[in-house]
Regions:
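Short, glycine-/small- and polar/acidic-enriched structural segments
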Residues: 1-146, 150-156, 169-173, 178-179
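Predominant activation on well-ordered alpha-helical scaffold segments within soluble catalytic domains
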Residues: 16, 62, 116, 160-163, ...
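Transmembrane helix-loop junction
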Residues: 26, 117, 121, 161-164, ...
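Short amphipathic alpha-helical segments at helix boundaries and their inter-helical linkers
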Residues: 51-54, 145, 150, 243-257, ...
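Ligand-binding clefts/hinges and TM-proximal coupling segments of bilobed small-molecule sensing domains
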Residues: 109-125, 129, 205-238, 280-282, ...
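Secondary-structure end/capping motifs
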Residues: 193-276
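Conserved C-terminal helix/tail region of periplasmic/extracytoplasmic solute-binding proteins
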Residues: 263-301
Length: 301
């Protein structure tokens, strides 16, 4: 089985750990894990049959499904905004952001959506700042250090590195409690229907991977460091703490409200999206079957 992941970010650690801890193999799956940068590319790879499942961004799944494909979320990884807003040293309060430059990766992506949401929650209209597309998190941080940017939306471990440079964490969005289906494990309805035993092994392995992630910090950190290509273990520890403790659920259900939020956003360009049921974007039958058996609860006893 070929499984993809769409970014080298801490949000994708559970799928790396499931592979590296040997949990796919334990459940009888021979898995080749492939990095496929970007949600749209990952969706296309799934539709072409090159991969059978992908850990990827929610907006890409919703967009693909709205276009008529059968891609669905079979598990949730990040069901809320996990991002943090960092600012240069001189900015310590939200109102100081007015008229300033805020960096995201690309317009329309999860970080861009999150940045605009965060600004509104802080009482600032997105039109009151200049939002710039600057690519990867490391590029955004470099732009801040060079004085070309005043704030950026990032994830650990970049947050830890920024704080070392004297920058501020103005807002930790994980504390807002907003439901947005930022990332999850996606597959196709066709694959699930034709290969349900293999799909069940996949979801069982993934649930065990999350348990490993949450309960075996040292081993998980080593895997995260490998995939993120870093030796900065302080930053890796911050990544583990943020996602394993605050973000990733023991029972990784995608949320209907989180997907509805994405549909509402999509409706700005595709009005028909407002009438689409979030349940169309999910297939939780595998996870529910596993959960109903008591398997997940037993892992944590």
């Amino acid at each position: 089985m070929h499984i993809g992941y769409s970014a080298q970010a801490g949000a994708f650690a559970p799928i790396w750990i499931t592979k590296e801890a040997g949990l796919f193999k334990k459940n009888g799956l021979d898995v080749n894990l492939i990095f496929i940068p970007g949600g749209p590319t990952a969706a296309a790879s799934m539709l072409a049959g090159e991969v059978q499942a992908v850990a990827m961004a929610g907006p890409a799944v919703v967009s693909s499904n709205l276009a008529g494909t059968d891609l669905v979320m079979i598990a949730g990884i990040v069901n809320t905004f996990a991002f943090q807003i960092i600012t240069v040293k001189a900015i310590t309060a939200p109102q100081q952001l007015k008229g300033k430059r805020v960096g995201v990766n690309r317009f329309g992506t999860a970080p861009d959506i999150a940045a605009r949401f965060a600004l509104r929650r802080m009482g600032i209209g997105p039109s009151e700042v200049t939002i710039l597309q600057l690519g990867e998190q490391s590029t955004r941080l470099a732009a801040m250090k060079a004085g070309q940017l005043d704030a950026a939306i990032v994830l650990p471990p970049i947050t830890t590195i920024a704080e070392r440079e004297g920058m501020n964490v103005l807002l930790d969005m994980s504390e807002l409690g907003a439901e947005y289906q930022i990332t999850g494990l996606a597959s196709s309805q066709a694959f699930i229907a034709k290969n349900r035993p293999a799909a069940m092994k996949l979801i069982r392995s993934f649930v065990e991977g999350i348990h490993f992630y949450k309960t075996r910090k040292k081993e998980s950190m080593a895997i995260i460091a490998k995939y993120m290509r870093t030796n900065d273990m302080e930053a890796v520890a911050a990544t583990w703490d943020h996602f394993a403790n605050k973000i990733v659920p023991k029972k990784p259900y995608p949320t209907a409200r989180g997907i509805k939020a994405l549909l509402d956003l999509a409706a700005k360009e595709r009005p028909e999206a407002a009438k689409v049921s979030p349940e169309r974007m999910m297939n939780i039958s595998l996870l529910k079957e596993l959960d109903d058996s008591g398997f997940i609860d037993a892992l944590y006893k």
